[in-house]
Amino acid sequence: ASAVDCVRLIDPEARVDIRSSRLLVFDDKTTDGELAKIRHYYINAVESREKDLSVLSDMEQAEVKPVGALEGFREMADSELEPYCKTMGLAMNADDLREVVKYFRSEGRDPYETELRILDTYWSDHCRHTTFTTELEGITVEESFVKEEIEDSLALYLRIRRELGREHKSLCLMDIATIGARYLKQKGLLDDMEVSEENNACSVYIDVDVDGRTEKWLLQFKNETHNHPTEIEPFGGASTCLGGAIRDPLSGRSYVYQAMRVTGAGDIYQKVGDTLEGKLPQSVISKKAAAGYSSYGNQIGLATTHVREVYHDGYVAKRLEVGAVVGAVKAENVRREKPAPGDKIIMLGGRTGRDGIGGATGSSKEHNTKSLETCGSEVQKGNAPEERKLERLFRRPEVTRLIKKSNDFGAGGVSVAIGELADGLDIYLDRVKTKYSGLNSTELAISESQERMAVVVEAKDVETFMRYCLEENIEAVEVADVTDTARMRMFNKDRKVVDLSREFIDSAGARHYAEAKVGEVENRNPF
C-alpha cells in the first residue's frame, strides 16, 4: 500500500498494483522430505501459498457467494440446533441459536445469513465476554496452603456485593473483576474517572502543567490481547495487536505516545520437526511476531518502553500476545454527546477487504489441527501509515470538537463499530469503500479490516469534517443515519439485508451457567 501511494504521488491517476514475493531456489540434491520441512517452515497457509510463476493473476481465491435468506430456519427443531451450529461454523451454541429461532418466529420470517453472522459476532466470547459473564452456581476452593486467604477474599467480595445491593445480579467473573471499582466509586474515591457512553479505553482526569499553567487533561490507557491471530499468523497478529490497541484511546480522541509489550511462547529452541501438528514452530511465531510488532510501531512512530517475552510450556497451546498503550488529550477538546435522530455517521481511514472476517468468532472457538488451513481470513492486515494519518487528524482540536461520539473498527467490523454508536441506525453497505470488488453484504458487514474509524457528527458538520479528512489525505464517506427506530437496519443497493431490534441484539443470547473450582496451589513462590 505504501509503495502504491508513492507511485500515485508521481501520477495521481495511476492504476497500479504492487506485490512482493520470495523466491527460493534448490538444487536437485534436495530431497522431497527436506522440501516438505522447508515448506512447513517458510509457508504459513493462513497468509501465503506457493505461486505458479507461469501465471500472473490478481484474481481472488475465494468465490463470492450471494447472501440470501436461510429458508426454513425458524422451523428448526431443538435436535437440529447443535448440528446446525457446526455446519455453519458458528461460535454460538445451541442455547443461543434457540433464542435466535424464537426471535425470527416472532418476526414472522427467516433471517438473512448476514443477520445470523452479525448476531454470532455480537454474542461471541470476544465481544460479549461469555466466559466472564457466565453465572457461577458454586465456587469450590481446594485444599492448599493459601486456602484460608482465598476464602477470606471470596467472603470479602460477597460482603461488598451485599453492601452495594448487587445480590440480585449474576455472580460471575465479570462481577468479581469490577466489584472493586464499583466499591471505590460509591465511596467517592474515583471522582477523577471519566464516565461516558463511550467505552473505548480507561479514562481519568489529570492536571497537567503546561508552561506554568494547570490544564485539565484526559489520560487514557488500554491493553489488547491478540493471542489467536498471532498464533496462526504471527506477523499480522502482533502488528494489529498494537494497531488495535492504539485505535481504542485514539477513538477516545487521545494521542497515543507510549506502549508496552508482554508475550508468552513455548521453547523457541525446539526442533522444527518436533512441532505439534497444526501448529507453527515456536521459533517462527516468536521471531515473526516481534518483527510484526516492531514494524507497526516503527512506522507509526510509537515508543515501546517495556518489552518482555516469557517462556513456558503452557504457551504452546496458545500464544500470549499483549499490547498496552497510553494516550492523552486536553479535556476541553473532547465532546461526548448522545447521538440524536438525524445525525450522520462517517466512516474514515482504510478500505474494507476480506481480511479479518470471522476474527471475533474465530478467537471465541476451540481450534484443532485444521485451524491453519481454515482461518485464513480471520487475521487482519495492518497498514501503519494509514493509522498515522488518523492520529494526525484527531490531534486537531477543530476536528475532535465536531465529533459527538466515536468508535474504532475492531471485532465485528461495521456491524459492531457502527452498530454500537446508537440504538437506531440505517447503514448503507454499498457506500463502504472497498479494497477490491466482489464483497457481499456479510463480508462488508463483519470484515475486520484495520485502520478504520466511525464518528457521529451533526448533519450540518458533515461537509466540514470531510474537508478536514481530505486535508490529511484520508478517505471518508457518510455511511449511516441515526434513527429513532431502535433497530439496526442495513441496506445494499436499496435491498434490506439486516433488520434487527436493538433489544434483541443487546440480550446477548442465552444465559450460561458453570461451577468454578479454585485448584490446589502447589508453588509457594508465585513468581
Feature map (PLM): residue ranges:
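Aromatic/hydrophobic pocket-lining residues that form π-stacking "cages" and hydrophobic walls in ligand
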Residues: Y293, I418, F465
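Anionic-ligand anchoring segments at beta-strand to alpha-helix junctions in alpha/beta enzyme folds, i.e.
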Residues: A417-T442
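Core nucleic-acid recognition elements
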Residues: A1-H367, E373-E386, L393-R401, G410, ...
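Short active-site oxyanion
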Residues: R452-M453
